[in-house]
Regions:
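C-terminal catalytic "cap/lid" subdomain
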Residues: 1-160
């Protein structure tokens, strides 16, 4: 796409957020914490040290892991579209306001979501919603986040 050469590396699922204690302390003190941005380098423990790995952590799965570890009830994944769509870019395109985790799994099996784009967002949302009863994930546009939180837009993913 005119961006030159890119190195292909593994993208493992995050196993833990090493800084979770500090993040939790900040959250509990009322601070707004921005964490788990895209392109993070995963680390591995080697004795008392951490060593970087030749890999990159997916921001959606890292955010899901963080939300689970913080015992959050809601996970909001911000993206470039207002809602998740099936048949994206086709004449029968359909924007979804909500879907159960079972419906999401069915759409994923039908290859409705693009790998490296909407697919990891939906996968992370499903993982979060199924991790504990009562959890809901929201996927929406950054500029519509407030309306999404208020239930006016976005796609809600929940376990039925």
């Amino acid at each position: 796409a005119g961006r030159g050469w890119r190195r292909v590396v593994a993208s493992p699922l995050p196993q833990e957020i090493i800084e979770i204690g500090a993040i939790n302390t900040l959250v509990e003190s009322g601070q707004l914490v921005i964490a788990c941005g895209g392109g993070g380098i995963p680390v591995m423990r080697h004795g008392n040290h951490l060593k970087g790995a030749s890999a990159v952590i997916d921001k959606d799965f890292a955010s899901e892991r963080l939300a689970e570890d913080l015992h959050a009830d809601y996970l909001i994944i911000l993206t470039a579209v207002e809602k998740v769509a099936i048949h994206f870019g086709q004449p029968d395109e359909q924007w979804l306001s909500e879907m159960t985790t079972d419906e999401a799994r069915q759409y994923m099996a039908q290859n409705e979501f693009a790998p490296g784009s909407m697919l990891p967002k939906v996968q992370a949302a499903v993982k979060f919603a199924e991790s504990r009863p009562g959890r809901t994930a929201l996927i929406t546009l950054l500029q519509k986040a407030k309306d999404g939180i208020l239930g006016k837009t976005g796609t809600r993913i929940y376990r039925a």
